[in-house]
């Protein structure tokens, strides 16, 4: 009987509860709409200007040339420093001046601290398992602390100086050897510099520069050049690959097999090589041979808090970051100096005044303001990362006098910031003097925003500046540089980056080496 009564009570309860639930739902709906309306009324900030686009696809066709930083900069001349575009189903807010970029990176950071990654970057970063692409959370704080403590912080940089000195000496020796053997032939700057940077990154990350390694998962032995391709070149190319589903999330269920297979294969090969390198070094550690490197630090200090996959990814990040961004800045700086004998000679005079007949070293860098200005000006004109990886607005905020809605993407156009005619006089010109004789302070490392700002400032900024400056200084001190035939017009860049599309080709001539003594 009780059971029957209970069964009879069900429809009665439903009959009473249905309207109650409906009324409650309607009430909550109106309350939510009222709160939204009040927020809009209380805000005196309008939405950003919109760049006109097409239905459904928005502004995608206007970005098809794959150099969005330049398109963004052109649009800023018409729509202002902050505006809104549509990339398919997504709303993107583009920031084009230092003021609004700093506001986003520092003042309003708490509202936009989440990274918005493409499908390719999600796979290649193992779902944000590296410092540069993670959200601002406990993993980010711990991982960055380990990176600074072991590798990139000031104290760690002093410990790794021996590796940098060896790298710079090797670079100079190779260029000098080429100049003596082939005095009239252009040298491929990137080939030499890139190889030595990769060696440095390997020493700092895993303890040694590996010439070859057997990779069990691939059942093959890889050369150093093959490792470089798998660990650096392929991921860099994959990171800028576009999956059309990124622009239409509601269609992500549709397969894109060619894209997925390509990126997953890069991911598999990268992991296979990193596992082989780590296992090789674990055997070295087990034998009792300790080396001051990132791997040894992570295994001794973070093995209990980080997974094996996270450790693998952090080590890979240290390799690819050191191998790539410093190269971009240094190659462009040498391009600019090679086509400008007057400024090259001015730098040489500064080095000679500071060092006399001694070889330039890191202690002397603080006495070379023009060299620092060359580094800063190259960062400004040829920023290694022209657009900061997208961020996600997880709560409504205000930027630059506009209301930024929740759910928007934020794109900080570093290239546009550094081409702002309201801040920089003749920004299209490479003119280091603007950082020496003007109001700009050459000690302000983040003036050009190339290394970000606030809590997400680039951990490798100090190392990048040190390596690039000492390399530029030593190369100018020991060699005379001029561009090869047709090289001055060779300024095309690779895809979404500011990488020089074709490696720098220069004619070099040794200076009076007997006047440069090793100190």
UniProtKB/Swiss-Prot annotation:
Keywords attached to this Swiss-Prot or TrEMBL record, sorted alphabetically, are:
Chloroplast, Heme, Iron, Membrane, Metal-binding, Monooxygenase, Oxidoreductase, Plastid, Plastid outer membrane, Transmembrane, Transmembrane helix
EC code(s) of this entry: 1.14.14.86
Broad EC category:
oxidoreductase
Task: List this protein's GO terms for biological process.
Answer: ent-kaurene oxidation to kaurenoic acid; gibberellin biosynthetic process
Q: Which reaction does it catalyse?
A: ent-kaur-16-ene + 3 reduced [NADPH--hemoprotein reductase] + 3 O2 = ent-kaur-16-en-19-oate + 3 oxidized [NADPH--hemoprotein reductase] + 4 H2O + 4 H(+)
Gene3D superfamilies from the xrefs?
Cytochrome P450
Q: Which family does the UniProt entry place this protein in?
A: Belongs to the cytochrome P450 family.
The task this protein performs is described as: Catalyzes three successive oxidations of the 4-methyl group of ent-kaurene giving kaurenoic acid, a key step in gibberellins (GAs) biosynthesis. GAs, which are involved many processes, including stem elongation, play a central role in plant development.
What is this protein's name? Ent-kaurene oxidase
Q: Which organism is it from?
A: Salvia miltiorrhiza
What is the name of the gene encoding this protein? Answer: KO
């Amino acid at each position: 009987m009780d059971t029957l009564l209970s069964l009879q009570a069900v429809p009665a309860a439903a009959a009473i509860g249905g309207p109650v639930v409906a009324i409650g739902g309607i009430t909550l709906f109106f309350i939510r709409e009222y709160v939204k309306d009040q927020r809009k009324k209380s805000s005196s900030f309008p939405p950003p200007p919109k760049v006109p686009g097409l239905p459904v696809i928005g502004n995608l066709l206007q970005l098809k040339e794959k150099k969005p930083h330049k398109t963004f900069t052109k649009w800023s001349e018409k729509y202002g420093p902050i505006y809104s575009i549509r990339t398919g189903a997504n709303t993107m807010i583009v920031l084009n001046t230092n003021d609004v970029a700093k506001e986003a990176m520092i003042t309003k950071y708490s509202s936009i601290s989440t990274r918005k990654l493409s499908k390719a970057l999600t796979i290649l970063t193992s779902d944000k398992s590296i410092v540069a692409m993670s959200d601002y959370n406990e993993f980010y704080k711990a991982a960055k602390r380990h990176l600074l403590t072991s590798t990139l912080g000031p104290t760690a940089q002093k410990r790794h100086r021996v590796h940098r000195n060896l790298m710079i000496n090797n670079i100079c020796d190779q260029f000098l050897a080429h100049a003596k053997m082939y005095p009239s032939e252009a040298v491929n700057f990137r080939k030499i510099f890139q190889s030595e940077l990769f060696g440095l990154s390997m020493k700092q990350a895993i303890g040694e520069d590996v010439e070859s390694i057997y990779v069990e998962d691939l059942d093959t032995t890889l050369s150093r050049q093959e490792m470089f391709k798998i660990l650096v070149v392929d991921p860099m190319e994959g990171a800028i690959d576009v999956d059309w589903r990124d622009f239409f999330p509601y269609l992500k269920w549709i397969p894109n097999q060619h894209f997925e297979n390509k990126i997953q294969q890069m991911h598999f090969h990268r992991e296979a090589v990193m596992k082989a390198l780590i296992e090789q070094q674990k055997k070295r550690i087990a034998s009792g041979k300790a080396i001051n490197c990132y791997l040894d630090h992570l295994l001794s200090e973070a093995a209990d808090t980080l997974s094996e996959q996270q450790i693998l990814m952090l080590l890979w990040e240290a390799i690819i970051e050191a191998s790539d961004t410093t190269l971009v800045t240094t190659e462009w700086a040498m391009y600019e100096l090679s086509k400008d004998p007057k400024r090259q000679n001015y730098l040489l005079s500064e080095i000679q005044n500071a060092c006399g007949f001694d070889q330039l070293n890191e202690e002397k860098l603080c006495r070379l303001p023009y060299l620092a200005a060359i580094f800063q000006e190259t960062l400004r004109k040829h920023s290694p990362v022209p657009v900061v990886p997208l961020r996600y607005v997880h709560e409504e905020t205000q930027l630059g006098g506009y209301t930024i809605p929740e759910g928007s993407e934020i794109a900080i156009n570093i290239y546009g910031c550094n081409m702002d005619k309201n801040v920089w006089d003749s920004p299209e010109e490479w003119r280091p003097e603007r950082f020496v004789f003007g109001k700009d302070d050459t000690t302000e490392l983040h003036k050009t925003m190339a290394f970000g700002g606030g809590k997400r400032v680039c951990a490798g900024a100090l190392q990048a500046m040190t390596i690039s400056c000492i390399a530029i200084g030593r190369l100018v001190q020991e060699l005379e540089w001029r561009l090869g035939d047709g090289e001055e017009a060779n300024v095309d860049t690779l895809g979404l980056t500011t990488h020089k599309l074709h490696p720098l080709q220069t004619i070099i001539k040794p200076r009076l080496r007997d006047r440069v003594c090793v100190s």
